[in-house]
A protein has these predicted regions:
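Gly-rich Lys/Arg/Thr-decorated short loops/hinges at beta-loop-alpha junctions or inter-strand turns
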Residues: 1
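Active-site-proximal beta-alpha core segment in soluble small-molecule metabolic enzymes
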Residues: 4-8, 12-15, 25-173
Length: 173
């Protein structure tokens, strides 16, 4: 079976990044390379982008993040999937950014920071209708109260995945 094929040209990808920067200025970019770069090749795309320190590479799981680290990628790497007890300490050791989307995740991170002193960069995810991962938006005050009592938990950012952003009516998004 013959299917679509994508070719990634280093110079064109770099030019696209430069063009984006003309609109956003000197800000960090989070570029999704998960699922093997959506078929473009995780290592291929990451090797092109990793020359720019202010690019954060987003992967789905710890295995993709480890593969990037093993291949010399020093950029910040953000893992979209929910943290797991069996790999979270390894993520902290590799200085990976993690997704916190459930109360159990917060409790786990709080315990690990207390026990190990390792301090990862954390992004909180709130569910805004996608219903996959994320704190319920009605719990936001409780989450922030919990965190205000624990200043050692380093929150780098807050994000969501808008479920209807690509539809005609964006009032919910």
């Amino acid at each position: 079976m013959i299917g679509p094929k994508a070719y990634i040209a280093k110079d064109k990808l770099e030019r696209n990044i430069k063009n984006i920067r003309t609109y956003i200025g000197p800000k960090k970019l989070m570029i999704v390379v998960k699922a093997n770069g959506y078929g473009h090749g995780l290592l291929n795309v990451a090797s092109i982008l990793s020359s720019q320190e202010d690019i954060i590479l987003c992967v789905f799981n710890i295995q993709e993040a480890i593969l990037l680290r093993e291949n010399g990628v020093r950029n910040n790497i953000f893992i979209f999937s929910r943290i797991q007890q069996d790999w979270v300490i390894r993520a902290f050791e590799l200085n990976l950014w993690v997704n916190i989307c459930h109360w159990d995740d917060l409790l786990l991170v709080d315990r690990i920071i207390s026990e190990t002193g390792l301090c990862p960069k954390i992004h909180l995810k709130f569910d805004t209708g996608m219903t996959r991962l994320g704190f319920d938006i009605t719990d936001s005050e409780k989450v922030f109260t919990f965190l205000s009592d624990r200043p050692k938990i380093p929150i780098e950012g807050i994000y969501s995945h808008f479920s209807t952003a690509d539809e005609g009516d964006i009032s919910f998004a």
